[in-house]
């Protein structure tokens, strides 16, 4: 009996140890397989990310004219491929893949990185200026959003900047600015000569172009935006107002006055860009803001508002009187005008029409809630601050990621999204 019991115990332990050994062998094998799988996945991902960086470097360095390329190669024991495609004139998509081990081998894994590139819009700046001329930021000045000067950054006192500051030619003056963001010198972002012409092209392709029939004779268009998504307008050659739906007048949201001036105010419902082109020598290509320009859904209280306006001039954008719309002398300029828009003055500036007229005192502030880009920094008041408007510029954060229709771009590509 003892011998039989001992034998049973031995057989039992033998079976138990056999099963245990088999289990731990399987665990060890699975661990190795899992490690190999993880190594292959992470290596394939690293190759894909590196390939995306190679593609980005080639794109930013060479700026291919056909806006597309394709290449492949070997890396880290695996292989990669990069392909760039143009979705539309403002959007490029790059697809980078990494494979490890190389395709055809056991356990081969492929990972993909997709990157979207787009041209940066000028409305991403809180304030952009080609040159500051002899003007300087000083104590009491506050700039919201990023600021760029393509010339020098002139500073006196302690102005405050709530955003990144960049300049092409360094800092002048003895000031000590307070910058709640980064500062970088030697950054060149020129204003392209094609900014306004690109808007005209967009207006001619699905928008509205209002031509001056007697160019270079004076020609003015007077336009009022209505909160019901219509626009009322007339020209200096026709005293009768016409009211039409914006979607009918300009389906793509772009209106261009060719060889003329534009006078504009009202409440924008929808998304619109209005522009004026023409030669400064004939006094054309200007936009006159003759009253409040607001969004139907106020972005100051509703950051999700989809109403958006762009104001583009080949030369200057002026703040003017409401009476200009009525054809009367500008005797009563608006007090505390509000402009909710992105403003772009390609060869000129944004400034106040009444800056040196002693008749216009106690006008308050001009509040621009949006973005300003101009060739040179303009003024809205005289040096004593007695006339004109005190400037108050606030950046509309919606413009960080969205722009009015066909709004001018810097021509410089930037990464819009990176998907891994």
Predicted regions and their residues:
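Long, well-ordered mid-to-C-terminal structural blocks that present hydrophobic/aromatic surfaces
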Residues: 247-320
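Aspartyl protease catalytic domain
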Residues: 183-260, 265-267, 278
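Protruding loop/beta-arch "assembly-hinge" segments enriched in small, turn-prone residues
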Residues: 392-420
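Short, ordered "entry" segments at domain starts
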Residues: 88-93, 99-208, 249-250, 254-256, ...
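Sequence/structural signature of small/polar-enriched beta-strand/turn repeats
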Residues: 16, 161-175, 185-194, 292-307, ...
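Beta-strand/loop motifs with alternating small/hydrophobic and polar/acidic residues, enriched
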Residues: 2-151, 419-420
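Extended C-terminal subregions enriched in glycine
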Residues: 302-369, 373-386
């Amino acid at each position: 009996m003892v011998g039989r019991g001992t034998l049973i115990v031995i057989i039992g332990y033998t079976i138990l140890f056999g099963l245990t050994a088999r289990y731990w062998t399987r665990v060890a094998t699975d661990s190795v397989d899992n490690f190999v799988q993880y190594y292959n996945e992470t290596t394939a991902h690293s190759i894909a990310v590196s390939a995306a960086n190679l593609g980005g470097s080639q794109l930013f360095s060479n700026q291919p004219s056909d806006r597309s390329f394709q290449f492949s190669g070997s890396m880290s024991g695996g292989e990669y491929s990069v392909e760039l495609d143009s979705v539309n004139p403002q959007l490029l998509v790059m697809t980078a893949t990494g494979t490890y081990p190389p395709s055809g081998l056991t356990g081969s894994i492929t990972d993909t990185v997709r990157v979207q590139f787009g041209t940066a819009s000028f409305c991403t700046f809180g304030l952009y200026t080609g040159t500051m001329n002899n003007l300087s930021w000083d104590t009491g000045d506050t700039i919201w959003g990023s600021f760029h000067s393509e010339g020098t950054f002139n500073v006196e006192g302690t102005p405050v900047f709530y955003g990144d500051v960049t300049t092409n030619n360094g800092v002048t003056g003895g000031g000590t600015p307070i910058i709640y963001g980064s500062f970088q010198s030697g950054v060149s972002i020129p204003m392209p000569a094609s900014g306004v012409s690109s808007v005209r092209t967009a207006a001619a392709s699905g928008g509205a172009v209002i031509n001056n029939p007697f160019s270079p004779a004076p020609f003015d268009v007077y336009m009022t935006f209505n909160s019901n998504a219509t626009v009322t307008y007339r020209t200096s050659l026709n005293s009768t107002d016409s009211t039409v739906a914006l979607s009918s007048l300009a389906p793509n949201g772009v209106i261009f006055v060719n060889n003329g001036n534009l006078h504009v105010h009202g409440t924008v419902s929808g998304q619109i860009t209005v522009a004026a082109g023409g030669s400064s020598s004939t006094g054309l290509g200007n936009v006159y803001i003759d009253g409040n320009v607001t969004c139907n859904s106020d972005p100051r209280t509703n950051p999700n508002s989809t109403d958006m306006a762009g104001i583009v001039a080949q030369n200057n954008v002026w703040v003017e009187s409401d009476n200009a719309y009525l054809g009367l002398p500008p005797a009563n300029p608006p007090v505390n005008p509000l402009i909710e828009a992105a403003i772009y003055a390609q060869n000129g500036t944004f400034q106040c029409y009444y800056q040196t007229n002693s008749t216009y005192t106690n006008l308050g502030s001009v509040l621009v809630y949006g973005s300003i880009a101009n060739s040179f920094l303009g003024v809205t008041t005289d040096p004593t601050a007695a006339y004109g408007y005190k400037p108050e510029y606030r950046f509309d954060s919606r413009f960080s990621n969205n722009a009015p229709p066909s709004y001018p771009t810097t021509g410089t590509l930037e990464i819009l999204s990176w998907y891994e």
